[in-house]
Design a protein with these regions (language model features):
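A conserved pocket-lining segment of Rossmann-fold NAD(P)-dependent short-chain dehydrogenase/reductase
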Residues: 57-58, 71-92
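Conserved beta-loop-beta element that borders a ligand/cofactor-binding pocket
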Residues: 27-33, 45-68, 117
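Short, hinge-like loop/turn segments at secondary-structure boundaries
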Residues: 41-43, 75-78, 158-160
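Conserved beta-strand termini and adjacent loop/short-helix elements that scaffold enzyme active sites
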Residues: 60-63, 85, 143-146
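Mid/C-terminal beta-alpha module of Rossmann-like enzyme folds, strongest
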Residues: 95-184
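NAD(P)-cofactor binding segment of oxidoreductase domains
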Residues: 1-23, 41-52
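Short-chain dehydrogenase/reductase
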Residues: 1-5, 35-44, 87-95, 118-121
Length: 184
């Protein structure tokens, strides 16, 4: 929490002093829906500071990145089993996130949130299973309705946009087909 609040206060202070006309921040889809998560509670506090910071702003809520699949699996592993929530998941490529943030940054401030997501929805366990198979990782993947994600139990749609979202172009299978070094 302290990292996000302190860094955001500092950035807002220096942005105001520099005359910044459009403050852009990257956050996470579902931030406001998962208050049990310490990480997402900190992101929500960051967003509150930005909204009250007096600078025109846009907050980009992105879904998780394909590049995080292995790390998510590692964090959810007990023994040789990966336990992930039994929910929908709509991750996107980091390249698409960067493009979306860039488009928002050169546009007019929305003084609100823009949601961006991958072009496909998956069951969380199916996506992790596909990702691990691409890495030739033999761990078993189990959909567990009580598995925690960022410290919280999730609802079916906690990690996907609820309303209209801008969708990335890169599909998960296309991303998996890239050279292994790009998937790190």
């Amino acid at each position: 929490m302290e990292f996000f609040t302190t860094s955001t206060r500092n950035l807002l202070k220096y942005a105001a002093a520099a005359g910044v006309k459009h403050y852009v921040a990257l956050s996470v889809v579902g931030t406001e829906r998962i208050p049990e998560s310490p990480y997402l509670r900190a992101k929500a506090a960051q967003e509150t500071l930005i909204k009250g910071g007096g600078i025109p702003y846009s907050i980009v809520h992105a879904t998780q990145f394909f590049e995080f699949v292995k790390r998510i699996a590692d964090e959810a592993t007990v023994g040789t089993t990966v336990r992930v929530p039994a929910v929908l998941f709509q991750p996107m490529a980091a390249d698409d996130v960067a493009k979306a943030v860039g488009r928002v940054a050169v546009g007019a401030p929305v003084n609100g949130t823009v949601e961006v997501a991958g072009p496909q929805q998956f069951r969380f366990d199916d996506l992790i299973r596909q990702g691990l198979a691409a890495y030739k990782d033999p761990r078993e993947v189990v959909a567990d309705p009580h598995a925690r994600y960022f410290g919280a139990e999730l609802d079916e749609r906690s990690l996907v946009p609820w309303g209209e979202a801008r969708l990335g172009d890169i599909r998960f299978d296309e991303w998996l087909g890239q050279p292994a070094l790009q998937r790190r």
